[in-house]
A protein has these predicted regions:
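A short Gly-Trp-Pro
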Residues: 1-141
Length: 141
């Protein structure tokens, strides 16, 4: 089984992710854009039990803008780590947090909110897949 290590910007918090993600892609929602201070968020989705804080758990802060997303960050440097989605039993570990993971996007979600069009041939979902409560509808690139 593969194990990938990650850490915050200053290294006070370290994590591991075990196995392979449930999915990976790009989120274009306003919430992710605002949180990441960028036009798109590269995500990797893991089952909750695959993600472990291995160092500095006392330095992990949390912000709940919604009940669906519990955003975790380092209290020392402010570096973003991951977002826990308890309703789905999934954790979104930002691709940049685990630099050795061979990121390969498979989908764009919330593309209807996109401010950066990406013509890469991947499926573009209007919101979320239907199994996660979205419409599952695709939109043009």
């Amino acid at each position: 089984m593969s194990v990938y290590k990650g850490k915050c910007f200053c290294g006070a918090v370290e994590i591991t992710v075990d196995g392979e993600p449930v999915g990976a892609g790009y989120c274009h929602c306003a919430s992710c854009r605002s949180w990441s201070a960028g036009p798109v968020n590269a995500f990797t989705l893991w089952k909750s039990d695959a993600v472990t804080v291995t160092k500095g758990e006392e330095n992990v802060g949390v912000f709940h803008k919604t009940g669906r997303s519990h955003r975790k960050w380092c209290r020392i440097c402010g570096g973003h780590l991951f977002t826990d989605h308890p309703e789905w039993n999934l954790i979104d570990v930002y691709a940049a947090t685990i630099p050795e993971f061979p990121f390969k996007a498979g989908v764009h979600v919330n593309y209807a909110q996109s401010v950066l069009r990406m013509r890469d041939g991947l499926p573009k979902l209007k919101d979320f897949p239907s199994e996660l409560g979205g419409t599952g509808e695709t939109v043009p690139e």
